[in-house]
Amino acid sequence: MISASRAAAARLVGAAASRGPTAARHQDSWNGLSHEAFRLVSRRDYASEAIKGAVVGIDLGTTNSCVAVMEGKQAKVLENAEGARTTPSVVAFTADGERLVGMPAKRQAVTNPNNTFYATKRLIGRRYDDPEVQKDIKNVPFKIVRASNGDAWVEAHGKLYSPSQIGAFVLMKMKETAENYLGHTAKNAVITVPAYFNDSQRQATKDAGQISGLNVLRVINEPTAAALAYGLDKSEDKVIAVYDLGGGTFDISILEIQKGVFEVKSTNGDTFLGGEDFDQALLRHIVKEFKRETGVDLTKDNMALQRVREAAEKAKCELSSSVQTDINLPYLTMDSSGPKHLNMKLTRAQFEGIVTDLIRRTIAPCQKAMQDAEVSKSDIGEVILVGGMTRMPKVQQTVQDLFGRAPSKAVNPDEAVAIGAAIQGGVLAGDVTDVLLLDVTPLSLGIETLGGVFTKLINRNTTIPTKKSQVFSTAADGQTQVEIKVCQGEREMAGDNKLLGQFTLIGIPPAPRGVPQIEVTFDIDANGIVHVSAKDKGTGREQQIVIQSSGGLSKDDIENMVKNAEKYAEEDRRKKERVEAVNMAEGIIHDTETKMEEFKDQLPADECNKLKEEISKMRELLARKDSETGENIRQAASSLQQASLKLFEMAYKKMASEREGSGSSGTGEQKEDQKEEKQ
């Protein structure tokens, strides 16, 4: 915090107020580019040099994630190992330390709710004390804890994990999916984030990419990515709105598409509004009804709650296509009178009534986005729906009422974001040359000045990359250092906005208040990540940082997490190798026993007994498979296979010789018969 005392760092005060017209001329010095020149700079900035190999596009979603790659001029969504085009963003840790990701993790959530993490994207880049985090703590079965840096982390089996780590485990699954398809290592990626993510959340997402072993070339906004997916093959110029209501976040972006240039005019949203909230609202309704009917409170039973949570999600999805659904959960819980079953009918109208306030919360951001973009609903040529929640008929009707037109269904709401990320990857790799993306910063950026006022340097919806400087001065006589507090938000007082970070400029020569000239420069890169510098114009002394909040992951944290992720990857590889070897061994045992039964009359008894001993040894090895390597199991299985092949070869030879013997004796008898007939 900037102190007003002489000894400590003082609050900055705008130089224009203390130095008259001269200082005023220093204010608001943009990087001085015309619009056309800016576009040329942006084109250059958006084309990365010497990118080798494919660039994968990843939609790291709250509920589900998706990965796509460019094939020529078309983006292709890839199927994971389970054959699905989207992967649940769920990570679980079993009692024996095994890590599960995706559908395997989701499937065991009912029996392991305390160690199964879902929707952790809502925690990424957030402090433990944030009101949203405190609200989440009451709604999830797993433990959210305060990390040593004040951030919100999660805990499983006594181990702490940052939300970036959990995101990295999901990204590793996406990376593996891409590598299985490509047939080689996937290193470069474009990852999407909600448009309304602040700097801390964007930085934490980049950290997740780094932990997973990816080189994150660009972090782009989800609605912008969806617009790329929609508009890549469109030739006409138009203004579009992208309404993105996903699993955990809501974004609205207004874009202008003109001859391959995708220019974001404004963006708005709510980073704590999505399908998870709809599930939670329905869950509360079900629990309340169950308590009214049975007198049993389910909120103390995590396993029962997890079953209700899954049933609520399923019912929500079914009501998008049906007007009524049944929720049946037998043996949900029990009391002294015996087991209790849940059986409930739910209509679409009832569900809409339960979540109507959540849907209404999307209206104000849409109106604000249109106002900021200076467009009316009649100017918008198309409304694109993105995110699974936009399948809900009531949401679609709300969008239609809001924009005065039926929304387009031209893109797949689950896949459009990953497709757009892959297209941006193609742009960065130089494979897609006729597309330019001009995005914006979603929130205003500035510093705390005298009296705790938030002084904005860069307003929201400014096109990025961008750079802006402003000159400030000291607030006290003889002040030798100033503390720069960097904030992001729209409130008038700095304390009401998100504190991104702070740093101190020292060594200012003592002078009366208002005399020193301190130039503060904000530079936002194409990822939307903030770089700040402060320079004493009198001495030339400069201090600069890439903003990292007082929380966030340090370089050492990230390096340790990268090592842990590599360790997990190695463990996963060994586990897979062992499972494959066990499957091979069990197959060989089955085949051997089947053949022994089939050829028992042709096989020597002593050789059979030897082979049975080999099978017994193999079974003993498989009984302790968790402590054996895949290579040991494979070698033992191969040895058994070789022994069985030799034995069955003997059986085949014996059978063949018996057939030949019976065939020749049959021929001799035939000749004797012919002789008798002639006589």
Curated annotation (Swiss-Prot):
The known regulators of its activity are described as: The chaperone activity is regulated by ATP-induced allosteric coupling of the nucleotide-binding (NBD) and substrate-binding (SBD) domains. ATP binding in the NBD leads to a conformational change in the NBD, which is transferred through the interdomain linker (IDL) to the substrate-binding domain (SBD). This elicits a reduced substrate affinity and a faster substrate exchange rate. Upon hydrolysis of ATP to ADP, the protein undergoes a conformational change that increases its affinity for substrate proteins.
Q: Where in the cell is it found?
A: Mitochondrion; Nucleus, Nucleolus; Cytoplasm; Mitochondrion matrix
Domain of life according to the entry: Eukaryota
Note down the stretches annotated as region Interdomain linker.
Answer: 432-441
Provide the E.C. number(s) assigned to this enzyme.
3.6.4.10
Impact of altering residue 415 to K? In SIDBA4; uncertain significance
Annotated organelle transit peptide span: 1-46
Q: Which reaction does it catalyse?
A: ATP + H2O = ADP + phosphate + H(+)
Q: Name one GO cellular component term.
A: extracellular exosome
Q: What class of enzyme is it?
A: hydrolase
Composition bias of kind Basic and acidic residues appears in: 669-679
Residues carrying Omega-N-methylarginine: 513
- Which segments carry the region annotation Nucleotide-binding domain (NBD)? 63-431
Q: Sites of the modification N6-succinyllysine? A: 135, 138, 206, 300, 368, 394, 567, 600, 610, 646
Disulphide linkage map = none
Can you tell me which residues bind ADP? 63-64, 313, 316, 320, 388, 391
Residue positions, PTM N6-acetyllysine: 76, 135, 138, 143, 206, 234, 288, 300, 567, 600, 612, 646
Q: What keyword terms does UniProt attach to this protein?
A: Acetylation, ATP-binding, Chaperone, Cytoplasm, Disease variant, Dwarfism, Hydrolase, Methylation, Mitochondrion, Nucleotide-binding, Nucleus, Phosphoprotein, Transit peptide
Q: What are the Phosphothreonine sites (modified residues) in this protein?
A: 87
What are the boundaries of the region Substrate-binding domain (SBD)?
A: 442-679
Q: Where is this region: Disordered?
A: 656-679
Q: Which family does it belong to?
A: Belongs to the heat shock protein 70 family.
Q: What is known of its domains?
A: The N-terminal nucleotide binding domain (NBD) is responsible for binding and hydrolyzing ATP. The C-terminal substrate-binding domain (SBD) binds to the client/substrate proteins. The two domains are allosterically coupled so that, when ATP is bound to the NBD, the SBD binds relatively weakly to clients. When ADP is bound in the NBD, a conformational change enhances the affinity of the SBD for client proteins.
Q: Which disease is it linked to?
A: Anemia, sideroblastic, 4: A form of sideroblastic anemia, a bone marrow disorder defined by the presence of pathologic iron deposits in erythroblast mitochondria. Sideroblastic anemia is characterized by anemia of varying severity, hypochromic peripheral erythrocytes, systemic iron overload secondary to chronic ineffective erythropoiesis, and the presence of bone marrow ringed sideroblasts. Sideroblasts are characterized by iron-loaded mitochondria clustered around the nucleus. Even-plus syndrome: An autosomal recessive syndrome characterized by epiphyseal and vertebral dysplasia, prenatal-onset short stature, a distinct craniofacial phenotype with microtia, a flat facial profile with flat nose and triangular nares, cardiac malformations, and additional findings such as anal atresia, hypodontia, aplasia cutis, and others.
What is the name listed in the Swiss-Prot or TrEMBL entry for this protein?
Stress-70 protein, mitochondrial
